[in-house]
């Protein structure tokens, strides 16, 4: 698994995340976030609207959770998440995620106010792009972890640029 959302190559492929020797969309925050959300929706549907099962399946795999449910049914045991025999990491993952969500929801944590302004933009590209100056690619590299071999941008569906530099980069491409 790789990237912010820890997508496996198979899941990435299923949700149309591009992977090549030049570009790994699992490392791209935009492509991977879209795929992770699509994957969660898929799991939520597969587990009949049970978010606990869906979250567990995101962590340990759909098949593993389905087997645990099937085993509990055979033994006449409840099939809710808390009664399933799952790996320790998964048994802790779901409650930790729920606790974090509850903290955010209850406003018990203070976060600094941020300006709600668009900071980045995506610039569609096709083919290959070669960034000429080191300054150009050094400013883009932290926003484009999916691009494997800077300064050459090959196979990427887009690049992420600071919104205040969008016109400048549009002129280059």
Question: What annotation goes with each model-predicted range?
Answer:
Residues 14, 19-22, 26-47, 52-56, ...:
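Extracytoplasmic and endomembrane cell-envelope/extracellular-matrix remodeling and assembly machinery
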Residues 1-16:
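Short, surface-exposed glycine/acidic/tryptophan-bearing loops
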């Amino acid at each position: 698994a790789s990237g912010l959302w820890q997508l496996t190559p198979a899941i990435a492929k299923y949700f149309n995340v591009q992977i090549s020797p030049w570009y790994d969309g699992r490392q791209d925050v935009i492509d991977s976030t879209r795929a992770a959300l699509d994957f969660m929706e898929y799991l939520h549907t597969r587990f009949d609207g049970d978010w606990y099962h869906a979250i567990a399946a995101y962590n340990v795999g759909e098949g593993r959770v389905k087997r645990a449910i099937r085993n509990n049914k055979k033994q006449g045991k409840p099939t809710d998440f808390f009664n399933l025999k799952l790996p320790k990491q998964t048994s802790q993952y779901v409650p930790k995620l729920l606790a974090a969500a509850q903290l955010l929801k209850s406003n018990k944590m203070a976060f600094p106010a941020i300006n709600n302004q668009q900071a980045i933009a995506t610039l569609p590209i096709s083919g290959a792009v070669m960034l000429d100056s080191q300054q150009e690619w050094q400013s883009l590299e932290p926003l484009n972890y999916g691009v494997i071999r800077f300064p050459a941008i090959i196979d990427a569906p887009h690049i992420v640029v600071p919104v205040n530099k969008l016109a400048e980069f549009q002129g280059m491409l």
